[in-house]
């Protein structure tokens, strides 16, 4: 079961790619994760999703928190950089940025979008093994995509451990997750898919926690899952944030707002995005912690 950005028939590519639901890749069977990700991201426009008005809420929220901890001269790492929306933004602000990305299609776009004045490098690699990077190097580490696509606790902890390893003591790590409840509400109940036995088999009948495997592409989390992952690490949580909160439940409304109303909506969003009674309903969640 996944929080999959599904291509929905009858709507534009930008609109459909921002729909969060679960789409089971029955045709891929047991294909390896790398091949699945290459096929998905080879036809998916992540950069334009973040540039759409509704997608910009997630981007602006993430950047708002990153900028709380940025200082001149800091080194930044983005693991799972995709096409470089965050890396390029930070490099153009004058920061030295290294990026790691698994999918070649994304790397090609990343390189095509790199300006001559950017101090940025990109490596092809896996979040679970950042062997090309040395310990205690970065002031800020962004892990904004890999946790979506890791399906075992061992793999998830490997990615977190690597991000922490390469971050300096007292550096700040930003780890993003897909939330369980948004998919349950919008897809399972909103589209009635929970009535289908295939999906019922993927959902705990008591807790309504969805399960995933690589063929389903996205892993879904609740806060208790994230808390369990973090127990082995010497870190201090700084913020636990819903980066889009209500936004993806009302994408069309957001996209049709005039500038003044959208600005007011952002003020509201920023006011509630750390509320512990609401964050669990967000499609995307950001765990921000300091390396002790």
Ranges and model annotations:
Residues 131-141:
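A short acidic, Gly/Pro-enriched loop at the edge of an enzyme's catalytic core
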